[in-house]
């Protein structure tokens, strides 16, 4: 009798694997409750992706790599890389996307290097863009906090962390030592900003530069400016690098860049995106569609020829890009097929027509 009861109890008891799974789920639930959603997830799981609202990055490749379709609203994002790698282009593209959706954007230009004509070429409505050129780091971060607290701004870009020079350093003499001042300033500002950003549903993008650590024997000698606080407070960190120069008849017309998602608290990290940035035009949408179309077997490549639905669309990538530029309906269909395969929201035809109409009006005005 006693033996049969014990046998039945053993059969009813969950297996070791099941009990472990249950314990892990409870631990993950407790961690998320304590530290917030996205603090822990299974690396390869689609369920790890949160249903967060986003502002598209302006690059379909990058939206896919981010896993959620853009920059998460109410979070801090850091974009860093070497000079002339496309950091400002990436942020201006995001500003254009935010404005297209009726949002308000601000650009805190601590480097005093924003080119309005270039911003306009990337689709930024410069008449509606709020711009500030602060004198010191404290002023820049206070302006950022005031804008966030207004609850009316969708996207704020700070260019760049390296240019956020503390007031004491500006007012001091050239040879004075100001060790750790900027790191302290960033740490204090981010402690105040993080909670406010989440409540106001603003995306704050910090552009950062790369520096070399002296005396590093093992590992990467590269580091970003402004101390460690920004690394911790960011939900997304992007490392952008130029990988090759795009040439047309021996003339440089753009750069191909690779963006690594170094940190992502909204979806599994470590994904990469490669796309073209054309000089004076920005991120090449058609170039991305050709690359992604081939990758997802929507566009077929045989030798140098590209074809879509058995119809040849061009010999060489440039010809295929030109075909998609001249046939926006087909380009939209291909983009929506790519979006559908990557679980991103689809675009509607009306939006596409509206944006083309706006482009014509801008050309007429120019």
From Swiss-Prot:
A GO biological process held by the record: SOS response
- What subcellular compartments does it reside in? Cytoplasm
Coarse class of the primary localization is cytoplasm
User: Matching Pfam families, A to Z?
Assistant: RecA (PF00154), RecA_C (PF21096)
Described by its record, this protein's role is as follows: Can catalyze the hydrolysis of ATP in the presence of single-stranded DNA, the ATP-dependent uptake of single-stranded DNA by duplex DNA, and the ATP-dependent hybridization of homologous single-stranded DNAs. It interacts with LexA causing its activation and leading to its autocatalytic cleavage.
Q: Species name for this entry?
A: Leptospira interrogans serogroup Icterohaemorrhagiae serovar Lai (strain 56601)
InterPro entries annotated for this entry? AAA+_ATPase, DNA_recomb/repair_RecA, P-loop_NTPase, RecA-like_C, RecA-like_N, RecA_ATP-bd, RecA_C_sf, RecA_monomer-monomer_interface
Its family remark reads:
Belongs to the RecA family.
- Its gene? recA
Q: What does UniProt give as GO cellular component?
A: cytoplasm
Task: Please state what the protein is called.
Answer: Protein RecA
Annotated residues that bind ATP are located at: 81-88
Which terms are listed as keywords in the entry? ATP-binding, Cytoplasm, DNA damage, DNA recombination, DNA repair, DNA-binding, Nucleotide-binding, SOS response
Domain of life where this protein originates: Bacteria
SMART domains according to UniProt: AAA
One term of GO molecular function: damaged DNA binding
